[in-house]
Amino acid sequence: RYDNRPRGNPETDEGMDQRNGLIILQKTKDLMQYLYTSWVKYPKSEKPGFVADYKKILLEFLKYIITAQKKYYKKTTLQDADVQLELLRLFNDLSYDLKFIDEKRYLLISDRLCEIGRLLGGWIKSQKEKS
């Protein structure tokens, strides 16, 4: 169930981690769909290298988010996810610099990555407050 329905008790923090994870998961899924349509337009010569690495980082990020949802101690997993998010930003910048994507696509992907970053940052902050 990867939807935005609230779970747990809103009066307390119960279920807050699950909601954060589900929202980030949904936003990442939306980003994946958009990136997959973008990668079709990349030069054929870049698909086995650059695009494959980009996909690997995206899937690794997704893996960390799913893992963090399932773990009791989430802080290090979320920090690992944050590193992967930085790599996604770097690959987006490179895609634009190498002219694989136009400015409109670059800005749209950047906005989505920033939104995911804000959500992830809030989740990390909530974990630091717990410890």
Give the residues covered by each predicted segment.
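Amphipathic alpha-helical assembly/interaction segments
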Residues: 1-131
